[in-house]
Amino acid sequence: MASATRKDLLKKVYNMVPPMLESFHKGQLGRVAVIGGSEDYTGAPYFSAMASAKLGCDMSHVICEPGAGAVIKTYSPNLMVHPYMRQSKNVGQNENIESIKSEVVAMLSRLHVVVIGPGLGRDKLMQDTCAEVIQEARKQGIPFVLDADGLYLAQTRPELVDGCTECILTPNVVEFGRLAKAKGVNVDEGDPSELCSKLAKAFGGVTIIQKGAKDYISNGSQTLISEGEGGLKRSGGQGDTLTGSLATLLAYRKAYHDKIWDHGTNMEPSETLALAAYGGSCITRECSKLAYKEKGRSLQAADLTEHVHTAFLNVIGEKEETPKL
């Protein structure tokens, strides 16, 4: 698949996206959650969850700190916000740390995909809670995406993700360097695609999207390069559109493998995970391009959110016909 053209790859992503059928019920096209959002950071989980919603998942949740939850609820009534997380200093006298963790972990049974990290921060209890979420997600076979301070978990506790083929890491250049250092990979040797492959292999086959002028996507055995045109403004928060897009595409991937519609194709899980990563990258880059064309140097992360659906139509396209079950 590494030698496939952009057109070929996006056609496969198209094949993985469910059509819109009357027979589907609420939740079948994706139940995703973003775990993050703390006192200081409320925008990131919102941007991620809204990208998931705008790309078409049925149910988009945010699991966050109460202080963040009250704010995020005012951003959009379309998101389901659960203030179950706690920063260490905000644990109430009548609250038990283990019960806080278990309440978050209990949400997993309702979800198809989890994004961990947007607005999370590095508070120990927040990090420890997410560590337990990762362990339980692996047990249940739930795909997850790590970004921002979720990547700090992969850096400081690599055993949490080692060997997990249902995990996507989305580091920028600085975060990539930290992960490489944690795994003893020399970032000064080799070209970017080789380094991405080497780091993915060092983590035992996780999928890494190394964000940059080009996005390098690798699981250690195959590498894809996403180099569609993006915008020139590097405002913070654009990576949250990527994580949200990945979440919905991973949910569509589950629908594909569950065969909730007759798609007539038979791609392997390793291939569809790579395709979800590639599709998410392409959609995000298209969002950036569209938003930059409209806003120029004033572009902010929120501007990408409004272009998610158009980017999907431009890059992947809607099903022209709705096949029968």
UniProtKB/Swiss-Prot annotation:
Gene3D superfamilies: 3.40.1190.20. It catalyses: (6S)-NADHX + ATP = ADP + phosphate + NADH + H(+); (6S)-NADPHX + ATP = ADP + phosphate + NADPH + H(+). It holds the Pfam family Carb_kinase. GO terms for biological process: metabolite repair; nicotinamide nucleotide metabolic process. One of its GO terms (cellular component) is cytoplasm. Catalyzes the dehydration of the S-form of NAD(P)HX at the expense of ATP, which is converted to ADP. Together with NAD(P)HX epimerase, which catalyzes the epimerization of the S- and R-forms, the enzyme allows the repair of both epimers of NAD(P)HX, a damaged form of NAD(P)H that is a result of enzymatic or heat-dependent hydration. The keyword Ion transport does not apply. GO terms for molecular function: ATP binding; ATP-dependent NAD(P)H-hydrate dehydratase activity. Disulfide bonds: none annotated. The keyword ATP-binding applies. Its cofactor is Mg(2+). PROSITE patterns: YJEF_C_1 (PS01049), YJEF_C_2 (PS01050), YJEF_C_3 (PS51383). Belongs to the NnrD/CARKD family. SUPFAM superfamilies: Ribokinase-like (SSF53613). (6S)-NADPHX binds at residues 119, 172-178, 240. PANTHER family: ATP-DEPENDENT (S)-NAD(P)H-HYDRATE DEHYDRATASE (PTHR12592:SF0), ATP-DEPENDENT (S)-NAD(P)H-HYDRATE DEHYDRATASE FAMILY MEMBER (PTHR12592). Residues 9-315 form the YjeF C-terminal domain. Keywords: ATP-binding, Cytoplasm, Lyase, NAD, NADP, Nucleotide-binding, Phosphoprotein. InterPro entries: Carbohydrate_kinase_pred_CS, CARKD, Ribokinase-like. ATP binds at residues 211-215, 230-239. CDD domains: YXKO-related. This is ATP-dependent (S)-NAD(P)H-hydrate dehydratase. It comes from Phaeosphaeria nodorum (strain SN15 / ATCC MYA-4574 / FGSC 10173) (Glume blotch fungus). It is found in: Cytoplasm. Its main location: cytoplasm.
